Amino acid sequence: MHIEQITPELTWRLRRDVLYPNQKIFEMEMDEDAGGIHFGAFKDDKLAGVVSLFQKETDFQFRKLAVDPSVQKMGIGNSLLNYITDYARENNATRIWCNARFTAIGFYLKAGFIQTGNLFSKNGYDYEIMEKFVWTADLADFLISLNR
């Protein structure tokens, strides 16, 4: 399996198939797509997972994480999360966050995200904002030194 940057259009089919199966492919395009960075996980040269990442200063929001059901539970979602977390960290992020569907909260908790208590519903789905603070090695070393 490998992960690489892809065009927004390549995310749409998996977004639809996994997250919104009753919608049309063209409905998967987000206005924000042009301003985001999109990543695909490929297994056996087939697109198996996608995620879109959006930066606002030192905050990075990821959206529409989707893994093909035929390869779920194989670590692809975790690999995508680790990849975008590293990407965000390398680009001076302090926080990475998402609007997590209630059905995915356990997945994000296992990946080190925390629940914020900010809940909302949209398009028939219930969400909670979840976040993870990421630090560069220099900042982490500095914070550790404060506790010595």
For each predicted feature, which ranges?
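Short amphipathic alpha-helix that is part of the acyltransferase structural core
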Residues: M1-K43, V134, D141-R148
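Conserved active-site tyrosine of GNAT-family acetyltransferases
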Residues: R15, Y108, F113
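Conserved beta-strand in the GNAT
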Residues: G40, K46-F54, Q61-A66
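A conserved beta-turn-beta hairpin within the catalytic core of GNAT-like acetyltransferases
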Residues: Q55-L65, Q72, K122-Y127
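Conserved acetyl-CoA-binding loop-helix of GNAT-fold acetyltransferases
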Residues: V67, K73-D86
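Conserved short alpha-helix immediately C-terminal to the canonical SAM/SAH-binding motif I
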Residues: L80, A104-F107
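Conserved GNAT acetyl-CoA-binding A-motif
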Residues: A88-R101
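Conserved catalytic-core motifs of GNAT/GCN5-like acyltransferases
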Residues: N99, I114-K132
